[in-house]
Amino acid sequence: MKVLFQARPDFMKNPAGDTVQMVSTGQELKNLGVEVHLSADPNIDLSPYDFVHIFNITRIKESYMFFLNAQKQKKKIIISPIYWPPNAYLKREGASSNALAVWRHLQPMRARLVSECTLLLPNSHIEMNVLQNDFLKTAPFQVVPNGFPDSFIGATSQLFREQFPSIPKEFVLCAARVSPRKNQQWLARICQELGLPLVLLGPVNDQKYFKDVKSFSNVIYIGTLQGKLLSSAYSAAKAHALPSWFETPGLSSIEAGACGTVVISTDQGSPSEYFQDMALYVHPLDDISLRSALEQSFNASPLPLMHHIQKHYSWSKVAEVTLETYRTVIVQ
């Protein structure tokens, strides 16, 4: 089996959740014997491939070009939409006045991909329900969840403590792009009011926003971590908080939970389908909900969620589900 993955051209330069999903799935599929190639070329010759797998319809312009190329060459098309309507986020105070209009203007492109592809692979049933609500017609679908690296199982705090000995023993962690959608400024303010150190990991998307977040004296920014050091950071944290405007469901929340850390998550998007009643949920900009979750996190047990995530959401298991969907497409 030979499959071509296609995604936005800057998926490695500006890594985000779609990057992790695509690269992790591809690596695990290779371990299962699938030949996986990556390309951001909208005119690539598709004759060597059984089908095309396109990631992310939020950044629709590139995905639309991949889609047209596949249709032109009469190839089957699988789409991981990674979709959530950003209406509330785009209407927030300080947002660009035309951002929502641009989003709506591009919806017909998304509608075409969603209705004319061979198979949709949403990350949750909640995401699929939203797709069915936002678009008149949708292709057949199979839910394929997001995951965490199998190597994170059994992580301990030792490596992180050795590398960063000055960080307080008890701290709240947020591993995510530092950007308004991830809502770290709000998190920093509430943590400061509670006297809690906040450690931030991840790339900076918005320098002005980053400066605003860093203005809080309790914030410690340590850049981007990977592999064993990242899993050790999760393990060292008292809680991991991702109070974003929406998540599907938030890769760092899955990773933190797998490492045995209490998870505080936004209630917007699909987190509840993954974490059920084993996480603490907050509503964006509801100070009381975040303050309460942070206070509860220091006495909450991370073990039920850890066992649940480790049982269901490793990337190796995700790849097995993905491969089964590929087989159904090939025989169609």
Label the predicted regions.
Residues 163-182, 188-193, 199:
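Conserved donor-binding/catalytic core segment of Leloir-type glycosyltransferases
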